[in-house]
Amino acid sequence: MSQTASNAIQPILNLQENCSNFYKKINEKYHEQMNCKQGCARCCFVNLSIFQAEAYRIIVWVLNLDAGKKKELLELLQKPMQSEEKNFQNKLASPCVFLRDNSCTIYEARPTICRTQGVPLQFKQVDKENNINITVDHCPLNFSDQDNFPNKNEWLDLDRLNTLQSIAENFFLKNQQKQDSQIQLAVDKNQRISLTSLKKEVIKILEKEE
């Protein structure tokens, strides 16, 4: 794997680190109002597709695991998936393909969206009169005490995050080398990668290294 390939994912690495730091800051201040903790996977019962840069970042992380960790990850991913459960919207849903025993098997390399779950997310909405309004959303398990809700400057701007994600993705697509890519077959018509497809690619890589 070339140095160019590593440089291509640097923007997404930086963005994900910033998201994790933002979450940590909010969680430290409002930990009594947040139910996010190891073992809670209510937000993990979703079917996601992610940017190619995010998927490639996961591939790079997998390749850099030591032999013991690779074997452990392969065994986990080959286990049967968890059963359907109610997600944070109280709807019955299938779990993420990387979830095992309510724990994320790729936690260190998890996608950006997974790093922002739990914190207040602000985004713009257009009403019937074409007025732009700022809306804030959060996990219904968190911040039940509205009198102690985070201040507006502590909300994560989802629109800005999406813009930064797109910039990181464009940088990746411009700078990656095709011969380095191990996930081309997983790209869908929208140029995104489903986690289901990515899991298959990860298993192939791990099986080749056994």
Task: Enumerate the language-model features and the residues they cover.
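Short loop/turn segments that flank or connect secondary-structure elements
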Residues: 1-42, 46, 50-210
